Amino acid sequence: MLETITAVNQAVNSFIWGIPAMVCIIGVGLLLSVRTGFLQLRKFPYAIKTTIGRIFRKKDASDGAMTPFQAVCTALAATVGTGNIAGVAGAIAIGGPGAVFWMWCSALLGMCTKFSEVTLAVHFREQNKNGELVGGPMYYIKNGLGSRWQFLAVLYSLFGVLTVFGTGNATQVNTIVTAIDSALLAYGSSLNSILPTVNLVVGVVVAMMVAMVLLGGVKRIGSVTEKLVPFMALFYVVLALGVVVINYRRFPAVLASIVGGAFDPRAFTGGAIGSIFLSMQKGVSRGIFSNEAGLGTGSIAHACADTRKPVKQGMFGIFEVFADTIVICTLTAMVILCSGVPVGYGSAAGAELTISGFTATYGGWSSIFTAVALCSFAFSTIIGWGLYGSRCIEFLFHTDKVVGPFLVVYSFVSILGATVDLGLLWSIADTFNGLMSIPNLMALLLLSGTVAKLTKEFFAGEGAGK
């Protein structure tokens, strides 16, 4: 029975996270780009001006809401995770340096996809009985497509709830304990005997911290993420830029390998990778599944923003993809390629390859800093996905009374993630994560006209100037 479940899950997982999903996500992104006149390119300066340009402006949100900046920080908290460190390394190892080029290409379309998701989420959101703003794919399906499409909203929420415990929590906690264990073992193998106890303590501490943040509601979530996300992003960017600066002589050759390797991977991998398609597949998939454009999850956080202008909040969606993929994922690639560490093209690789890039440049002591970065990324992901799960279960049961018990269970899973190996369950959760894209992409396809209309009205009226 267990073997059958494993086989079925692997088959579905390969399909959902494989070529069909990429084609659908890219296709919808291209359609949305055409219908908005490639807004992500035409209005990119405006997007930066209305996002980064307003970060330091103090603004208080109304009760039950976040400021627009808190909303994007919460979305980034869930998006910028360990995949930015481990996933990029895997893409380069299997797809070669050229995978980075295709990652950039997918991000350009992903910007418009996420812009559309955020715009629709704010436009079709509701206010629950506690006065909190709630929205996301399930709400723009319900309010934008009508009752006959309600089943898609239910499916999205169901897949979301089934995803959060594994993808959003347990795998992230496992990354935290792995990073801490590695840092401890760097000081001597004699510490190996205390690792089980350390893992349990870490799991309990993480569970308590997660519960304290999530049970405080959207105001506390926003307050935490607006402080944590900029810190962890800046910390990682500075650390990675240092690697590039120290190894600046390698930068021109690295850039050439990224562009050239996209079209002739064999020439830059010693013949280990000879397929342009493989390079494209790995780069595009990393871009898509790093910034989550097409999954719709980030729009759940953006729907909490205290704003009356859906399109203006949508600009944060463009910024989010830019920050996640163009900045952070690219810097991870530069750490690996500029440091000169052996990549081992054609073989699987993960966070250890990125860590090797840092240690090759800074020395062994940098393992402490990479552990801090990994822990920060993982913890922020747990917080972001906790919000997503609470919104999904609230939609399924039509009441917020289930949210509290759900968050208690969600927090407890952190202990299991730190101490127990439940690989199959987390693999199934990863499959459900991919399944979330199906109802969301269908909704984006059917509501593409609404996105185009809202965008045109916004930039034609006074809204764009305010």
Name each model feature, range by range.
Residues L109-E117, G203-V218, V229-R249, S285-R286, ...:
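Selective recognition of specific alpha-helical transmembrane segments in multi-pass small-molecule
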Residues T4-I5, R35-Q40, G83-V88, G166-I176, ...:
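Transmembrane helix-loop junctions in multi-pass membrane proteins
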Residues L31-S33, S106-G131, M138, K142-N174, ...:
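Helix-loop-helix module between adjacent transmembrane segments
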Residues E117-K129, L241-S257, P265-G271, C304-T307, ...:
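Extracellular/periplasmic helix-exit of transmembrane alpha-helices
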Residues C24-L32, T36-I48, V173-I180, T197-N247, ...:
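Membrane-interface loop-to-helix entry segments
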